[in-house]
Amino acid sequence: MKLLSKIMIIALAASMLQACNGQSGMNKQGTGTLLGGAGGALLGSQFGQGKGQLVGVGVGALLGAVLGGQIGASMDEQDRRLLELTSQRALESAPSGSNIEWRNPDNGNHGYVTPNKTYRNSAGQYCREYTQTVIIGGKQQKTYGNACRQPDGQWQVVN
């Protein structure tokens, strides 16, 4: 549980740093930075134990934030809409391990969502682990996360 608290602190710090950019609302680069940092922290937490695990969380958060910010800055509104629609479809009905693809015909950006393990959280909601892979300008980037199904049927990212 302590590790989860540390990850939440990192995510909160990232969101406060984003708030300092002076814009009302979060821009696409800020959103990418925040989500990339949280995903990187989660991935980094899988390595090591004790202080080594904390270092993994910090390094993962930093690298995830940098990569997420780059992805967010490069994705346009259509890319984000296609990714969101594909994510909802993949999480709702795709078998674990399958790649559900999207492509923006206007700019060539594309990617896929891979849903993985399905589980129930402590509140009884169905949740899934997933990987999002995007190819922007020929460069591939991956993010990892978890999403839970809401009462209205939509899937919401929980980390």
From Swiss-Prot:
Transmembrane segments: none annotated. The keyword Lipoprotein applies. PROSITE patterns: PROKAR_LIPOPROTEIN. The keyword tRNA-binding does not apply. It is a lipid-anchor. A lipid is attached at residue 20 (S-diacylglycerol cysteine). Keywords: Cell outer membrane, Lipoprotein, Membrane, Palmitate, Signal. InterPro entries: Anti_2, Gly_zipper_2TM_dom, Surface_antigen_Rickettsia. Residues 1-19 form the signal peptide. A lipid is attached at residue 20 (N-palmitoyl cysteine). Coiled coil: none annotated. GO terms for cellular component: cell outer membrane. Belongs to the rickettsiale 17 kDa surface antigen family. This is 17 kDa surface antigen. The gene is omp.
